[in-house]
C-alpha cells in the first residue's frame, strides 16, 4: 500500500488510471490551481482535495464492471446450443413447435435445419424418430424420446454406445410387411402360410386394407407377424404406415407378371 502526499491511500494494481494522472505533466498545474482555490475558500485548508478524483475513479470502475456483467450476460444468452451433458426428453408424436420450446430455440431454426436436408415441414407437423435424429446431429444436442406405453427410452444419437442390460429387453415377434403390386399373389402366399382361405372374404379378391396375421414357425413355436398390404396405387398412404412399423419387408413379384 502506497501514499501520495499523505492524503490518499491507493493500491498500485487497482489505480492505474490515477497513477497515469499523477505522472502526467499537467498534474502540478492542476495541483497549484486546486491549492489556490482552496486557499481562497478556506485559508486553513491548503491540502489538495483528492476526494473528487477518487469519486470519479469509483464511478468509472462501477460503470466498467456493469458493462462487463452485461456483456457476459449477452454472450451467455447467445451461446450455441450445447446439451451434450444434458438429455432432452421428448414424448412421441412431438411437433416442430413443441420441440423448439423444449430445446429453447425458435421453431424457424428447426425448420431451416430440415429444409437444408430436403425436408419441407411446418411448425405443426409431427417429427418421427428419423427427423429427431437429424435435428439431434445438426444442432449437436442429445434428444431422447419416451414411449410411455412400453416405458422405453429411445436415444436419437447415432453414435451413442450405451450398454443395454439384457434383463430389461423383451423379445417380441418380428413384424414382416408383405408388399407388391396388385394381383401378384401377396394374400395367396400368406393364406398358404397360415393355412386359411383369405381371398374369398375380400371384395373382388383384392386387398383393400391392412391384414395382420400370426404365423408360427420352427420347433419352438416362434411367432412372426405378417402384415398384408393392398397393392393398388390408391392405397399408397396405407403402405407407408406399414413400412414405419415393420422390421422386415418382403417384396412379392409374380414370375408370370414380371416387373
Swiss-Prot record:
Tell where it localizes: Plastid, Chloroplast
Residues in coiled coil: none
Annotated keywords: Chloroplast, GTP-binding, Initiation factor, Nucleotide-binding, Plastid, Protein biosynthesis
Q: Where is the tr-type G domain?
A: 171-259
The entry marks the following residues as binding GTP, namely 180-187
User: Primary place of residence?
Assistant: plastid
Q: Which Gene3D superfamilies match?
A: P-loop containing nucleotide triphosphate hydrolases (3.40.50.300)
Q: Which PROSITE patterns match?
A: G_TR_2 (PS51722)
Query: Which InterPro entries does the record associate with it?
Result: IF2_N (IPR006847), P-loop_NTPase (IPR027417), Small_GTP-bd (IPR005225), T_Tr_GTP-bd_dom (IPR000795), TIF_IF2 (IPR015760)
Q: Tell me the protein family, please.
A: Belongs to the TRAFAC class translation factor GTPase superfamily. Classic translation factor GTPase family. IF-2 subfamily.
Primary role: One of the essential components for the initiation of protein synthesis. Protects formylmethionyl-tRNA from spontaneous hydrolysis and promotes its binding to the 30S ribosomal subunits. Also involved in the hydrolysis of GTP during the formation of the 70S ribosomal complex.
- In Swiss-Prot or TrEMBL terms, this protein is called Translation initiation factor IF-2, chloroplastic
Taxonomic lineage: Eukaryota, Rhodophyta, Bangiophyceae, Galdieriales, Galdieriaceae
Q: Point out the gene that encodes the protein.
A: infB
Amino acid at each position: 500500500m502506497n501514499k501520495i502526499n499523505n492524503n490518499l491511500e491507493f493500491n498500485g494494481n487497482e489505480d492505474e488510471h490515477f497513477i497515469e494522472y499523477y505522472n502526467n505533466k499537467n498534474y502540478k498545474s492542476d495541483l497549484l490551481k486546486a491549492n489556490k482555490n482552496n486557499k481562497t475558500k478556506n485559508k486553513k485548508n491548503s491540502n489538495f482535495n483528492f476526494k473528487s478524483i477518487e469519486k470519479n475513479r469509483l464511478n468509472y470502475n462501477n460503470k466498467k464492471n456493469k458493462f462487463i456483467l452485461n456483456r457476459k450476460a449477452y454472450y451467455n444468452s447467445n451461446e450455441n446450443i450445447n446439451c451434450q451433458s444434458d438429455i432432452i426428453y421428448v414424448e412421441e408424436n412431438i411437433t416442430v413447435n413443441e420441440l423448439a420450446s423444449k430445446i429453447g430455440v425458435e421453431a424457424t431454426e428447426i425448420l431451416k435445419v430440415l429444409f437444408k436436408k430436403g425436408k419441407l415441414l411446418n411448425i405443426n407437423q409431427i417429427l418421427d424418430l428419423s427427423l429427431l435424429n437429424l435435428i439431434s446431429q445438426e444442432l449437436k444436442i442429445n434428444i431422447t424420446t419416451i414411449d410411455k406405453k412400453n416405458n422405453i427410452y429411445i436415444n436419437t444419437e447415432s453414435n451413442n454406445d450405451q450398454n443395454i442390460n439384457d434383463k430389461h429387453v423383451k423379445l417380441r415377434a418380428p413384424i414382416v410387411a408383405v408388399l407388391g403390386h396388385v394381383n401378384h399373389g401377396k394374400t395367396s402366399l400368406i393364406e398358404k402360410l397360415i393355412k386359411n382361405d383369405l381371398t374369398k372374404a375380400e371384395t373382388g379378391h383384392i386387398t383393400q386394407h391392412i391384414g395382420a396375421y400370426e404365423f408360427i414357425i420352427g420347433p419352438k413355436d416362434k411367432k412372426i407377424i405378417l402384415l398384408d398390404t393392398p397393392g393398388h396405387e390408391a392405397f399408397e398412404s396405407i403402405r407407408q404406415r406399414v413400412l414405419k412399423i415393420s422390421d422386415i419387408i418382403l417384396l412379392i413379384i409374380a414370375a408370370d407378371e414380371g416387373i
